[in-house]
Structure formats: C-alpha cells, structure tokens
Amino acid sequence: MLPAPFEYHAPHTTEETLELLDQLGDEGKVLAGGQSLIPLLKLRFASPAHLVDVNRVPGLDVIEERDGVLRIGALFRHKAAERSTMLASRYPVIAEAAGQVADPIVRNRGTVGGSLAHADPAGDWGSVMLALDAEFVLQSKSGRRSVKARDFFSGPFSTALQPNELLTEIRIPAAQGRTGGAYLKLERKVGDFATVAVAVHLQMDDGKVRSAGIGLTAVGAQNLKAEQAEAALRGRPLDDAAINEAAELAAAAAEPKADQRGSEAYKRNVVRVFTQRGLRRARERARGGA
C-alpha cells in the first residue's frame, strides 16, 4: 500500500521547523529517522497532510557531556550510540540498549529522539531514559520546556509532546564516581520488539548504592520506572539480599498482559530475573569489570 498524499517540508533551521509546526498544528508530523513513521504511512495507520523532515536541521545530532549534564540530540542515531566509546564506558546502559534496537538497517537510520516521541511501550529507549532519570527538552515557537522522562510518557504511543513542539534534546545527569549499567532484553528473534526488557543504571559510593535507576519495557501501557525497587537500594551495599529485594519490587511494579509472547506470570518472572542479572552486571561494571 502507498501512503496517502502529503506535502513535504525540509526546513534548514530549528526556527523554521518551529514556525512550520506552529502553522500546521495537528496536520503536521515530524519525520526523523522514519523507521517507525514510514511503515505507518505505508499502511495508512498515519495519514498526516504534511511531513516536516528535520534531518537537515543542524545541531540536533549533538552528544556532549558538559556542566554536569550529558546532552543527546534528538537526531542522534542508534548506531552512533552503539559505537560511542564514551557512552560504553560511562553510560553502558545506553550503548548496550542501542546495540539491541531492531536490526542494523534500523539502527543506521533510526534516531533516539524519534523512538522516544513514537512512545511504543515495547520500544527500547523509554526504559533506558527512565533508569537514567533523563529529561526531555521540548521546543515550540513560544519557548521551551523540560519534561522528566517519568512525566513524558502518558500511554501507548502517547506523550506530553504537543503538535507544535519539537523534541530537540535529551538531558541526563552526568555519571559521578563509580557507575555501571545494563540492558537486558528478551525477544522472540533477533531484531524483534521486546517481550520484556529491563534497564539498570547504578552509581556507587564506598561500596554502597548512591543512586539506582530501573526502567521496564513492554510490561505496561507505557515504559515503567520501578521506583520502589530503586528506593530499596539507596544507601545499601549491593549484596544478594538487596538485589533480590529490588528484583521482587521491580516484578511487582510490572503491569504485563498475557499474549502470544507469554503469560502475565512468565513476564513478571522475566522482570525479576533480568533485574537481578542487570544489577549484578551493573555492579561489576561499577567496580571496573566488563
């Protein structure tokens, strides 16, 4: 099937993009990597009257760590995240998740910001950003605002992003001291959406957990943050007792639905096991291991 007719726009500046989005309102749709949007267009599940291609807008693919913040531009590609040595060493949960997004073709073109704006509950990036306590910079013609990841997702394929706004940047508190992370994903086959996935980010201080982030993928109407599990870890040595308690709390936070991929009990158990494995892997990385 071919997409419904649309008018194509290719702005060259952020200001031009925001002007277009302000004019078009609900009739406009932003095109980033296109790995989610283009299939929807072909199936006519989405039929916007206007497409606004932001790939020519400079500055949207930046990545830098400065003034205590890691800034990731919305057009930063999955493949670039996978290959970044800085991310692999300081934010391994990002690099590990990037390497498990779909397949090489999608990773080459797809963008972090586009995936987040699409807000598929089985998408990889939402849980990662929840674990990292990220916030998203949303810009419109009238100004900009920052929205915490936990407040950004409002349901399946639904976010706080307004039709006249552009997601321009993801901001993550810079890693401090000994940090570690992990992303574990269960899929039916390589390149598939997650049946269950768990993202973990840890910061350790004198053998104790200074901060912990745990995000859950594909076990709810949106990506979930296991806040009680995170709170249970803070200030404690990351021993087996702490890991097991956090894993139980993460499983309790999950809201899975039974489907052809597995029962509710099965998915909760995967959350439990992946949280245990993720915390142990993150602990080893925080200690300087692989």
Predicted regions and their residues:
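C-terminal structural segment of proteins
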Residues: 1-290
